[in-house]
Amino acid sequence: MRRITCCFPIKIHRRQPPSPPSTITLSSYEYSSLAVGIISDLKEEGCDTLLVKLQKDANRKIGMGVGVRDRGILITTVVPGSVAAEKLKVGDRILAVNGRPILDQRSVVKSVKASGQRLYLQIARPHKVHK
């Protein structure tokens, strides 16, 4: 008696959990309430909130590095002589890019790359960093 073996591909479908949304939608009232709450919390922590305008320059890089830390998304490096060096400090916490709250490090990088000639960063800066 001969044995016949059949081989054919088997596809295994695994259910992936849904990805978290990359954007959130808030009404203007919800956004205002959220913003007021965040600013109050930051003041208690000893931080000021600043709106920083960076003008992109074709001859110079923005020159900043960002990273995830326990306090959020922070400026981790600033290249001397860069556009960022004029207004940002290592330790600044990024709250929003071009008016949009940031969710993670990827959203900061994506928003910075997608911005036009002007880049607006809402940051929280600890009082001890001010000069």
UniProtKB/Swiss-Prot annotation:
SMART domains: PDZ. PROSITE patterns: PDZ. Residues 51-127 form the PDZ domain. It holds the Pfam family PDZ. It comes from the Eukaryota. Signal peptide: none annotated. InterPro entries: PDZ (IPR001478), PDZ_scaffold (IPR051342), PDZ_sf (IPR036034). This is PDZ domain-containing protein C52A11.3.
